[in-house]
Swiss-Prot record:
SUPFAM superfamilies: Aminoacid dehydrogenase-like, N-terminal domain (SSF53223), NAD(P)-binding Rossmann-fold domains (SSF51735). GO terms for cellular component: cytosol. NCBIfam families: PRK10792.1, PRK14186.1. This is Bifunctional protein FolD. Signal peptide: none annotated. GO terms for molecular function: methenyltetrahydrofolate cyclohydrolase activity; methylenetetrahydrofolate dehydrogenase (NADP+) activity. The keyword Cell wall biogenesis/degradation does not apply. Pathway: One-carbon metabolism; tetrahydrofolate interconversion. NADP(+) binds at G166, A167, S168, I232.
Length: 288
């Protein structure tokens, strides 16, 4: 069996185009364009690339894009003060603070300071809690993007055995909640999991997010499984690969996401979706 490729680039472009149409309709009706503030602290090269792609996507869909590039020496108090200012700014619908933050700044404190109605990354306890209670509003970007991919490929998830490899706050944990909402029987594995291979071999739908190149061998994949590879790993030779041995897995799976070009583009597209949603669901009411 040769797997069908789940093309994240194409779906992400569709999502962005749909948002652009809605933004154009808003402005034509005399409403303001949604606004996103992107905050980068320090000069981490990978973070600069991610932030650049987010800002570019904002401009493409017609958002107001605000950039705040702060020096490595920025204190936690200074960053919190900026967030307070942005929380009160009526032009801004979404606030994104690029992680990781420099040493000495508490990630949790910073993310919790963002107003839940401007938390377009979906990391605030309020938004995570709503997802857990089956009443999601702003949802974490990567898990929501993965659900969008499955939906756009008309993959019926109800009743599937879904296995999530990795239990991070950004992907693994919220992904497990999304999969429960999607009707899956869901297992989350982590560094203490025994018999990992057995779990993988049982998966109808496998989501891998550990950040280790080739962590899951292709021969572990169940015949006909759907494989979603969240990993983005750059090898010494410059090649970018996922957490799954792609060629071997693709020979057994029914669907698979490539790396690059699978999940990555969806994370940015979902951030754009979330910003429009925050504008429409939370901030339009205040304008009325």
């Amino acid at each position: 069996m040769a797997a069908k490729i789940i093309d994240g680039k194409t779906i992400a472009q569709q999502v962005r185009s749909e948002v652009a149409v809605k933004v154009k309709a808003r402005t034509a009706a005399g409403k303001r364009a949604p606004g996103l503030a992107v905050v980068l602290v320090g000069s981490n090269p990978a973070s600069q690339i991610y932030v650049g792609s987010k800002r570019k996507a904002c401009e493409e869909v017609g958002f107001v894009s605000r950039s705040y590039d702060l020096p490595e020496t920025t204190t936690e108090a200074e960053l919190l003060e900026l967030i307070d200012t942005l929380n009160a700014d009526e032009v801004i619908d979404g606030i994104l603070v690029q992680l990781p933050l420099p040493a000495g700044i508490d990630n949790v404190k910073v993310l919790e300071r963002i107003a839940p109605d401007k938390d377009v990354d979906g990391f605030h306890p309020y938004n995570v809690g709503r997802l857990c209670q089956r009443a999601p509003r702003l949802r974490p970007c990567t898990p929501r993007g993965i659900v969008t991919l499955l939906e756009r490929y008309n993959i019926d998830t109800y009743g599937l055995n879904a296995v999530v490899i990795g239990a991070s706050n950004i992907v693994g944990r919220p992904m497990s909640m999304e999969l429960l909402l999607a009707g899956c029987t869901t297992t989350v594995t982590h560094r203490f999991t025994k018999n990992l291979r057995q779990h993988v071999e049982n998966a109808d739908l496998l989501i891998v997010a550990v950040g280790k190149p080739g962590f899951i061998p292709g021969e572990w994949i169940k015949e006909g499984a759907i494989v979603v590879d969240v990993g983005i790993n750059r090898l010494e030779n410059g090649k970018v690969v996922g957490d799954v041995v792609y060629e071997d897995a693709a020979a057994r799976a029914s669907y698979i996401t490539p790396v690059p070009g699978g999940v990555g583009p969806m994370t940015v597209a979902t951030l754009i979706q979330n910003t429009l949603q925050a504008c429409e669901e939370y901030h339009d009411v205040e304008e009325a």
